[in-house]
Amino acid sequence: MKQPKFAAAQFSGNDQYTAEEKARFANHFVRFVETGFKPTVFPDWFYRRLSCTFGHIAHFDRNGFYEAWFSTTRRRRDFLQRCLTHPFYMGAPFSDAEDACRQWVRKSGLVAKLGVQVALEVETKERAELARLQAKYEKEAA
């Protein structure tokens, strides 16, 4: 098993969350992202906490949230971009854990990497459509 990236000592406990809970969340956040946003690494406890961070609001259920943010490469890239750009309010009960995740996303370079992947997926799809249309209209012209 990989070494956790975050330790409880990095976080402050408060009346809503312990430092251990924050470390557990931050480490699971990294694991979820590093495993390619696999649904099997998206348990209910993580959904409930994640859906209330980075300006998200809870969706109807875990599956709806997953579909909205992790079902395509573009959505995964947009999710990580939101982690970086959503206004940050230090002092909120979970803000130190959010900031740790935000810093990890920034250092990982994943937004740019996923952006390249999105561009390649779009190009592949567009080239396939171009080939289909050329074949269709070349037949008609012949």
Regions found by a protein language model. Give the residues of each.
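Short, extreme N-terminal segment that most often corresponds to the first beta-strand
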Residues: 1-34
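Charged/polar low-complexity intrinsically disordered segments, enriched in acidic residues
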Residues: 110-121
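Non-membrane alpha-helical secondary structure
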Residues: 14-17, 21-25, 38, 72-75, ...
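Short acidic, low-complexity intrinsically disordered linear motifs used
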Residues: 120-142
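Basic, mixed-charge low-complexity alpha-helical segments
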Residues: 4-5, 19-20, 99-107, 111, ...
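Short, flexible beta-strand-to-coil junctions
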Residues: 1, 60-63, 133-136
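Acidic, low-complexity, intrinsically disordered interaction modules
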Residues: 37-108
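Intrinsic disorder/low-complexity segments in short proteins, especially the signal peptide
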Residues: 11, 34-37, 42, 55, ...
